[in-house]
Amino acid sequence: MGSRIKQNPETTFEVYVEVAYPRTGGTLSDPEVQRQFPEDYSDQEVLQTLTKFCFPFYVDSLTVSQVGQNFTFVLTDIDSKQRFGFCRLSSGAKSCFCILSYLPWFEVFYKLLNILADYTTKRQESQWNELLETLHRLPIPDPGVSVHLSVHSYFTVPDSRELPSIPENRNLTEYFVAVDVNNMLHLYASMLYERRILIICSKLSTLTACIHGSAAMLYPMYWQHVYIPVLPPHLLDYCCAPMPYLIGIHLSLMEKVRNMALDDVVILNVDTNTLETPFDDLQSLPNDVISSLKNRLKKVSTTTGDGVARAFLKAQAAFFGSYRNALKIEPEEPITFSEEAFVSHYRSGAMKQFLQNATQLQLFKQFIDGRLDLLNSGEGFSDVFEEEINMGEYAGSDKLYHQWLSTVRKGSGAILNTVKTKANPAMKTVYKFAKDHAKMGIKEVKNRLKQKDITENGCVSSAEDPLPKTMPSPQAETQDPRLREDRRPITVHFGQVRPPRPHVVRRPKSNITVEGRRTSVSSPEQPQPYRTLKESDSAEGDETESPEQLVREPWGPTPAPPDRAASIDLLEDVFSSLDVEAPLQPLGQAKSLEDLRAPKDLREQPGSFDYQRLDLCRSERGLSMAAALKLAHPYTKLWSLGQDDMAIPSKPSITSPEKPSALLGTSPALPLRPQNQEGILSPSIKEETPIPTPGSITIPRPQGRKTPELGIVPPPPTARPAKLQAAGGPLGDFSSEPLQMDRERQAALSPALLSGLLPRAVPQGPTELLQPPSPAPGAAGTGSDALLALLDPLNTAWSGSTIPSHPATPSAATPFIPQLSFPPTVTPTPFVQTPLNPFVPSVPVVPPSMPLSSTPARPFGTPPASLGPAYAPSILLSSSGFYAPHRSQPNLSALSMPNLFGQIPMGAHTSPLQPLGPPAVAPSRIRTLPLARSSARAAEAKQGLALRPGESPLLPPRPPQSLQPTPQPSVPTQARDPFEDLLRKTKQDVSPSPAPALAPASTSVEQLRRQWETFE
C-alpha cells in the first residue's frame, strides 16, 4: 500500500523521556535525558536522537519564547517505518516531555503528555508511574474503543481508516486555518509532482501540523521520500539534498537555510501565507479536477467535518481512479498493472499528460504495488478511496473492472479461500456497492417512467400507486392555468404537437367516475395504451376503446361494486332529468342461443322479460356511459343479453355464452366476428356494427360518423309500448289471471327468448336455418314464420298465417288512448298508439320478393274480425330504444321493406305495476346510425318476437302508476302515406264530429307539426 505506518506494533509506545538542557556555568550544553520509562530501555542511539529532535530550534534566538507547546517529529527505522515523537515543551522551552510510538495517535498522546507534565510539576510520582505502566502494558485496542487508564485519564482509540475531520483532527484543523485555499492547491500540486518542499513557521505546533496535514491529503498515497516534519539544527544540510523531500523548518533556522544553494525548492511560509515555487505544477494539472477541488474547498471553508479531506479524496479518485482499467487478469497468472493501458484510457489533453508523469511517481508506484500485493495474496482491500471510486464516475463501471470483480469473487490464487474464510471487507464493500447501485438504478428508471406516464397520460400507471388519482377540476384549472400547462405532453406525433387533452372522463378500470373528475386506476397488467395522433383526435370529445383492450378484457357483464355504484350517479350532472337509481341486485350472465334451444328450457322456463321504461331523454353518450357501470342498472342488463350480430348465427361455435353488450350506434367501428354467406346482415351493416366490451364506455369517434341517408331520421322518445306476446296456447286459452299478467310483463329484448320459436333440433346449415322450423313442444303458439320472415332482409312476402294474434282479455280498466302514427283505414280501436314523431319517411322501394320455401299452418289461429290492426308484425327496437311507426298491411305477400315493421301498440296489460304514458323527459339527440335500414330492423326484430310461454320476468316490475287497458288485435289495413296523418288530423279538428279513437285528447295538429318540424 506504500504506507509507512507500522501495522500491529508490540506496545502502545516504546519509550517516554524527559529531556532538558543541563546548565553548566553560563553556557548551554547538549540536551540530556532526565528521566525515562521504561527504565530498562536500552536503545541508546534512539535516545541520543530524541534529545536533538526535542529542541528543533535555536534556543538562544528571540523566537524561543514563542515556541508552541506541542509538536511531533518523525524518526524512520530500518524498515522505513515511521516512529512519531510526540513532544510537549515546558514554559520557557527549557524541558521537553516526549513519547515515542509507532501509533499516529496525535490527540491521544498530546493529552497524555499534558497529564504526565502535570504529575511531574506536582511531583505526583505514584500517579505518574501508574499511568505509564498501565499504558505500556495495554494491548493495542481496536479503533473506536474507549480506554480508561485511570480515574481522570481515558481516551478513544482513533481510526486511521477514516477521513480526518475538523476539528477532531488537530493537524488538519491547524493546516486549514493557517494556509489559504490557493496555497493549499499549489502545495498539493507540488507534492503530486514530488518536488523538494520546505515549509517554514515560527510556531512548532503549526509547522508540524501543516506537514502532517498536507501529507494526509495525498491519501490513499503516501509521501515516499524524505519526510521530516521538523528539522533539527544539526540536519540542515538535508535541505540541499537532490532527492524530493518534505521538510518543516523553524523560523529561527531559516536564516542559515537561505544561505544554502536551494535550487528548484518550493517554499511555503506559513507565517506570511506565501508560497514560492519555480514550477507551474498547478496549471499543468487537469483544470476540471482542480476547479472542482477549489470550489469544494471554498464551500467547506466554514463548516466542520471531513469535507476538506473528502474534497481532496475526490480529486485523487479523479486522477487515479482509472487504475482499475489497467489491471491485467490472466487465468492462473498474477494480476499485473499495465502503464500503457492506464495512460491510453484518456486519448488526449492535460489528463493524459499528467498520467504519463504519474506513472513515474514513487508514490503512485507504491500505491499500485500495494494494491497488487493485496489482490494476489487474496487479502483484498476496502477503504474510502475505493468507495469513492465506486460512488463516483471514475471508470468504475468499465468492463475490465467488472472482470476484475468477477475474478476477485470466483478466486484467483488464494482469493477464493480468503473470501470464504475471512469474508474480507473489500468483497463486502464491492458487493454492497453493486447491490445498492442496482437498486438505485431500478428506482431511477421507475421514477422516470412514472414521470413520463404522468406527463403523457395525466395519470399514473404503475403498481406503486393503486389508488385513484383525482385530477384538477375544470374550475381549478380555469383559476390556475398552470395546472393545464403541466398536463400538456411533450411528445410529438407525426410531426405535430399533440393538443392538450380536454377535460373528458377517462375510463378507469373500476368504471366508477365521480362528477366530471377524471379518475384513473393504475393497472400493471394492463397499462394505458400509447395512442397515436389519429386515436388521440377522438379523445377530444370522449375516450374510445382500443381493440387491444377489447381482447384483454373479459367478455360478459361484470357487476360494479354495489357500495360504489349505488352512491355514484354518473349521469346526474350530465342529464338533469335522470331520476333512476341503480338497483343493488345480482345480475345473471347472458345465455347463448345454444343454451336456450334445449327443449327442457322451452318447457320449464315460463314467463318473459319485463321491458322497463327506458329513459329516452338520455343521449347516446348517456346510454353508453350507463352501460359502463358493469351493467348494474336494469336497463343495461337488457342490453347485455347477446344482441351483437342481429342475426341467428349459422354456426353454434361462433356464438359465445358470454356476449358483450351491443350498444348500437354508440361505439366506434370495430371488426365483427366472421359471418357466413347466408348471414342476414348486409356488408354495410356489418361494417357499422361494433362489438364493445361490457362495462366499457364506447363512444363513436367524430371521424367515424356517417351522413344519414335520405329519409332516415331517428324517431324521438315515445311512451312505453305494449309487448308482442307469443301466446302459450290456443287463442283465448288462459289458465289463470297471474299467468296473463306475467305474459304481459314480457320484454322482447333478448335473442335468448328466440328459443321459444326454435325447434328441438338446431339447424346447422344455412339452408336448414331458413327452413320454417316445426314448433317445439310446448310452444304451439309461437310464430316461426314471422320470425324467419323478420330475419330475412330480402323477404317481402308475409303470409297471413304468420300474423300473431293475441287473446282478448276482458278488462274493465280505464281506456287509455295513445297516439297513432299512421291510422288504419278501418275503424280504429281506442287503444292504438303512435310515437311522438309520426313523420318518419321511408323510401318506398320494393325489393324483389323472396318467399319462404314452405308456409306452415297458422300457429296462432284466426284472429277475430273485430280485432284491429294492433298486432300486425311490429318491431320493438330494443337495442336503440326507439320504436318504428306502425304500418297497416293489406297484402302481406307484397309488402315493401320500409312498411314491414309497423308500430307496436299497447299490449294486453292487466298488471297495475306498468306505467302509462310517455316519460316526461326531453327528446334525445338525433342518432347518426341509419336505423331505418331494413336489414338492421330485421336483425332487431328477432328480439321483439322472442317469447317463451310461462317464462317469469327477470327484472322487477315498475311501480304502479295507473291501470292499462287491453288492446285488441286488429286486421291488416292498407299502408298510408306518412303525411296523410297530418292531413287527417287537420280534417278531424275541422270536422264537427271527429273520431274519438283517432284524435286523442292530448294530441293536436300543432303538436304534430311542431314535432315534424323538429326532425326535419
From Swiss-Prot:
The uDENN domain, residue ranges: 13-145
Residue ranges of every copy of the cDENN domain listed in the record: 162-298
Residues where Phosphoserine is found: S473, S520, S522, S523, S536, S538, S546, S592, S750
BP GO terms, sorted: endocytic recycling; endocytosis; positive regulation of GTPase activity; protein transport; synaptic vesicle endocytosis
PANTHER family: DENN DOMAIN-CONTAINING, DENN DOMAIN-CONTAINING PROTEIN 1A
Lineage: Eukaryota, Metazoa, Chordata, Craniata, Vertebrata
Biased composition annotated in UniProt, kind: Basic and acidic residues: 479-489, 977-988, 1007-1016
Molecular function GO terms recorded: guanyl-nucleotide exchange factor activity; phosphatidylinositol phosphate binding; phosphatidylinositol-3-phosphate binding; SH3 domain binding; small GTPase binding
Annotated motif Clathrin box, positions: 569-578
Spans annotated as Disordered: 453-565, 681-737, 763-783, 935-1016
One GO CC annotation: presynaptic membrane
Recorded superkingdom: Eukaryota
Regulation (activators, inhibitors): The guanine nucleotide exchange factor (GEF) activity is autoinhibited. Autoinhibition may be the result of intramolecular interaction between the DENN domain and the C-terminus, which is disrupted upon phosphorylation. Activation is regulated by Akt activation.
Record organism: Mus musculus
InterPro entries, alphabetized: cDENN_dom, dDENN_dom, DENN_C, DENND1A/B/C, Tripartite_DENN, uDENN_dom
Membrane topology of the entry: Peripheral membrane protein
PROSITE patterns in the cross-refs: DENN
Subunit organization: Interacts with RAB35. Interacts with clathrin and with the adapter protein complex 2, AP-2. Interacts with ITSN1 and SH3GL2. Interacts (when phosphorylated) with YWHAE.
Biased composition (Basic residues): 500-509
Name of the protein this chain belongs to: DENN domain-containing protein 1A
Localization (cell): Cytoplasmic vesicle, Clathrin-coated vesicle membrane; Presynaptic cell membrane
In-chain residues carrying the UniProt-annotated modification Omega-N-methylarginine: R760
